[in-house]
Amino acid sequence: MTQYSHVKYTQSPTPSVVSGYSSASRLHSPLPPPANHRRDCLSATTKSYKYLRRLLKFNQMDFEFALWQMLYLFVAPQKVYRNFNYRKQTKSQFARDDPAFLVLLVVCLCVTSLGFAYVLGLSFWQSISFIFYVVFVDCIFVGIIIASFFWAVTNRYLRTNSLEPDIEWGYAFDVHLNAFFPPLMLLHFIQLFFYNWLISQTWFISRFLGNTFWLMGMGYYVYITFLGYNCIPHLKNTRIILIALPIIFLLFLVVTIIGWNATISFVNFYKYRVY
């Protein structure tokens, strides 16, 4: 009996092996995970916590690489998303784990908004209010809405099948930040040099140039957003995002022909918010 018991005991798998078998079978099981199985949720929470913790640790941020990304978002945005794919292979996530890009983007927003406030002749407190609106409303709050929309749509309708991993919300927000930077520089920086002496006038060339800046900015935003989701191999029909491009061009033609200067309208809107 003792020998039999010993043989029986040695043939039983160890608890760690049982746990491994259980985890493996859970991954391939068609049954839904148990209520206490929150691996993905906890992982996302942990990643978000680490990301937010690093926001004030500037010595741990790679600003040189973030500047490289900003440059290539203008000239070759495909190269930026190749790095996102590399991050997925090495760190098992598409979203950035380094907030350097976000920090530099906020700095650019503040600096260009100060220039915009100077051109508009805003007072000190109006300039502070203007910067607050641009950073926290126009960029971050609107970005949260847009990222949540694309996150929900891509996960529900654009995945090749339900077994593929979900698109991370953090990645959707990164796509928004990437797409936001070129329009920011076009509309909040380069356009300022033409506003007072040309774009703000009533001439045809004034509204044509002002509307062209908006056409380029919105075109950049749509195209970079498309690249962000098109680079993910398990998404399908991402070209539907490009439908917005001919619509934007048609709107450009219509508003230019009817005599509407989009830049002047948005400048008046900016003034209305801070007065």
From Swiss-Prot:
A Pfam entry, by short name: UNC-50
Region called Disordered, residue ranges: 1-39
TM spans (from-to): 100-120, 130-150, 179-199, 208-228, 240-260
InterPro entries recorded: UNC-50
Lumenal side: 121-129, 200-207, 261-275
Source organism superkingdom: Eukaryota
Subcellular location: Golgi apparatus membrane
Membrane topology type: Multi-pass membrane protein
An annotated GO cellular component: Golgi membrane
UniProt entry keywords in alphabetical sequence: Golgi apparatus, Membrane, Transmembrane, Transmembrane helix
Family membership noted in the UniProt record: Belongs to the unc-50 family.
Record protein name field: Protein unc-50 homolog
Gene: Unc50
